[in-house]
């Protein structure tokens, strides 16, 4: 298992930037790739790389953060696998005013093939569908992330 955190307010560079976690507060021994483990990750790098290591692996990922923005509007966060947004991980909130805070969270079960390697990044999503007219996208605001936690744990099934 690994758990990474962000404590201080961290503005992202754009509305499509990855979230860079600056501190790992829990990391079990099997979550080190140098020990034949299943995860390659370093603090300050947005990419979490999971290795299949010869057997099918199932992983639970959980993300939670307080989000804000310098402007009112929609902020959206999602999980990307090998550069592709996983649709059911997108979470969007509407901030009524600049510097308002809302909580965004998701959990997802992932499968990595036995000989596969997958890279995961949590990032801001640049646009989301308008609820009443889904074909018309809403451009999102640049998020400010604080009190964020992201963890990945390997499961047995």
Predicted regions and their residues:
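Extracellular jelly-roll beta-sandwich "head" domains, especially the C-terminal globular C1q domain
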Residues: 1-157
């Amino acid at each position: 298992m690994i758990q990474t955190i962000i404590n201080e307010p961290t503005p992202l560079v754009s509305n499509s930037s990855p979230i860079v976690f600056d501190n790992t507060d829990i990391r079990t021994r099997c979550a080190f790739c140098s020990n034949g483990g299943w995860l390659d990750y370093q603090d300050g790098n947005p990419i979490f790389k999971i290795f299949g290591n010869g057997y099918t692996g199932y992983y639970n990922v959980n993300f939670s953060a307080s989000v804000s923005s310098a402007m009112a509007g929609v902020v959206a966060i999602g999980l990307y696998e090998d550069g592709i947004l996983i649709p059911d991980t997108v979470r969007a909130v509407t901030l009524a005013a600049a510097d308002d805070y809302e909580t965004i969270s998701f959990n997802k079960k992932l499968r990595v093939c036995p000989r596969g390697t997958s890279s995961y990044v949590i990032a801001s999503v640049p646009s989301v569908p308008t609820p009443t007219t889904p074909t018309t996208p809403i451009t999102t605001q640049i998020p400010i992330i604080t009190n964020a936690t992201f963890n990945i744990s390997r499961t047995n099934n």
